[in-house]
Amino acid sequence: MINKIAVLGCGWLGLPLAKSLLAKSYFINGSTTSAEKLPTILSNGIAPFLVQLGSKLTGDDLQLFLNVDLLIINIPPGRSTNQADDYEAKISALTQEIQKSTIQKVIFISSTSVYPDNQTTVDERCNLINESDAAKRMIKAEEIIKSIPNIQSTVIRMAGLIGPNRHPGRFFAGKENIPAGLSPVNLIHLDDCIGIIEFVIENDLWNQTYNGAAPSHPLKLDFYSLASQKYNGSLAKFLSETGNYKIVDSRKIVSKGYQFKHPDLMEWLLQTPQS
């Protein structure tokens, strides 16, 4: 039975997730790499911890942070080359600490970027043949997590993230000649990121891999043109061409009974107030 949960990485997704889990009566530890964010975590009723993940895991009261039943790992690779190169070492170091702890289960937040843009629909059964260095690093991280001895782990591959303070219109507002306007989008709202994670926990869906992407895939041209207008009233002009793309299929988690809160991305966008 899961009573205590640690959220490693209380950022845009991690903090709302921790708050939602707390509201469901779980005891929550939350980590950040920034001392300035500790008061925010504490003010939400979450036990705050300053944790740095490098070639070894460091932080005050590290054993106390990991004294939980479930660890949710929400730490994507850094954007710089050096940060990304260290990602495998960071995940490996983390697994060493997991094995010393009371942790029984792990949820690893991955990305649909592990799938190649091969002009087809992709699901969890696909071979992950992707030449992108970033994808290779994430695939390797998934493998490391899945191989931790005596730990039940589930990987959730999230699509592009949208929601509060992450309005999709900000990406292309006012730009012109944007390529691949006829390619479909793969996105997921924050509410469904949290919803899928909680669904996995509540239904004991362990030793699995699930995609997290809204079941609707509007064209990039249609979605981001409307998003840009809703964001600041400016236009985004796309080229009417199909570039490299994929359509991420999330029917596996739906088949288990999950119902998306925002299945229709265009409908969500229409209902979103203008920024």
Where is each model-derived feature located?
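Conserved beta-loop-beta element that borders a ligand/cofactor-binding pocket
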Residues: 140-164
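N-terminal Rossmann-fold NAD(P) dinucleotide-binding loop
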Residues: 14-15
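NAD(P)-cofactor binding segment of oxidoreductase domains
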Residues: 63-107, 140
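C-terminal amphipathic/interface module of NAD(P)-dependent oxidoreductases
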Residues: 47, 51-55, 234-236, 240-275
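Mid/C-terminal beta-alpha module of Rossmann-like enzyme folds, strongest
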Residues: 196-250
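Conserved Rossmann-fold NAD(P)-dependent oxidoreductase catalytic core, especially the SDR/UDP-sugar
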Residues: 92-131
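Substrate-positioning beta->alpha
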Residues: 155-158, 167-168, 178-201
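Glycine/proline-rich active-site loop of Rossmann-fold NAD(P)-dependent oxidoreductases
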Residues: 139, 162-175, 199-210
